[in-house]
Amino acid sequence: MSLQNDIITALGVKSSIDPAQEIRVSVDFLKNYLNAHPFITSLVLGISGGQDSTLTGKLCQTAITELRNETGTSRYQFIAVRLPYGVQADEADCQDAIAFIQPDRVLTVNIKPAIESSEATLRAIGVELSDFVKGNEKARERMKAQYSIAGMNAGLVVGTDHAAEAVTGFFTKYGDGGTDINPIFRLNKRQGKALLRELGCPSHLYTKAPTADLEEDRPSLPDEVALGVTYEKIDDYLEGKPIDANDAATIENWYRKTEHKRRPPITVFDDFWQ
C-alpha cells in the first residue's frame, strides 16, 4: 500500500460525499457523545470567521438545538467564543459567521493582554520570543481561555481539525490542536465547503483565502503560501487522485515531519519516529 493510501485510511477521507449525509453524521456524533456523558451540558468553540470554525459552529448549534428539542430541557447550550488579539482584521467576517451560526451565547476574550504579560515575563528572564513562537503562544492562549470557559460550564472544547489540516500538521500543538472532540475530522477542505453550501452559509466565509493569521511579521499569511501547496492539490491527494510529484512530495514531507502532532506524548513504547 502506498503512503497516499495509508494517509487516506488513517484520516478516514472519502473520495466523494453526500453533504447532507455528512452534516447528519457530525450532528449525530456530537449528540450521541453528549447523551453518553450526561454530566456534559455545553459545547465551546472559538469562532474566527473562517471556513472551519463557521462550519463547526453551525454543526454544534444544530446538535445542541436538537438535543434541547428531543429532551424537552434547556440544560444544553453552545458557547461561541470570540478570541481576538486586539482588533481582528476580518472582524466583519466574524460577525457574519456569528449571524449565520446563531449561537446560544457569545463570549469575547481579548487575548492580547495575556500574551503581552507572558512575553514580558519571559523577556525578564532572558527569553525573547520570535514572531513565530509568539504566534503559537496566541493559539495556546486561545485554547486556554476556551478550556476555562468549558470548565465553568460543564463543557467540551470543540476542535476544527479536518483532514487537509491534519495531513500537513497545520495547527499548533496544544493550541488549536488540543481539543476534546473534532466533528469534521474526516473531511477535506472542499468537502467542508460543500457542507457549508448545503447549510446556506454566506459564500464569502468559505471562498476567502484561509489564514491562521498568527504572525505579526507576516499578517494574514495565506495557509497555502505557508504550506507551499494549494488546498486543491491537498484535497485531490486525500481523495486518491494523482497529483504532481512535487506537490505529493511536499504533502508527504509535511505528514512525516508533523507525525508527533497527531499522537499523544511520545513514550518508550513508541517507534514511529525511528
UniProtKB/Swiss-Prot annotation:
Presence of keyword Cell inner membrane: no
A GO cellular-component term linked to this record: cytoplasm
Family note: Belongs to the NAD synthetase family.
EC number annotated for this UniProt entry: 6.3.1.5
Positions annotated to bind ATP: 46-53, 160, 189, 211
NCBIfam families: nadE, PRK00768.1
HAMAP family named in the record: NadE_ammonia_dep (MF_00193)
Primary gene name: nadE
InterPro entries: NAD/GMP_synthase, NAD_synthase, NH(3)-dep_NAD(+)_synth, Rossmann-like_a/b/a_fold
Function summary: Catalyzes the ATP-dependent amidation of deamido-NAD to form NAD. Uses ammonia as a nitrogen source.
GO annotation terms (biological process): NAD biosynthetic process
Reactions catalysed: deamido-NAD(+) + NH4(+) + ATP = AMP + diphosphate + NAD(+) + H(+)
Name assigned to this protein: NH(3)-dependent NAD(+) synthetase
Annotated coiled-coil segments of the chain: none
Pfam families for the chain: NAD_synthase (PF02540)
Record pathway: Cofactor biosynthesis; NAD(+) biosynthesis; NAD(+) from deamido-NAD(+) (ammonia route): step 1/1
UniProt-recorded Gene Ontology molecular function terms: ATP binding; glutaminase activity; metal ion binding; NAD+ synthase (glutamine-hydrolyzing) activity; NAD+ synthase activity
Taxonomic lineage of the native organism: Bacteria, Pseudomonadati, Pseudomonadota, Gammaproteobacteria, Enterobacterales
Subunit structure: Homodimer.
Binding site for deamido-NAD(+): 140, 173, 180, 260-261
Residues annotated for Mg(2+) binding in this entry: 52, 165
Species whose genome carries this gene: Pectobacterium atrosepticum (strain SCRI 1043 / ATCC BAA-672)
Keywords, in A-Z order: ATP-binding, Ligase, Magnesium, Metal-binding, NAD, Nucleotide-binding
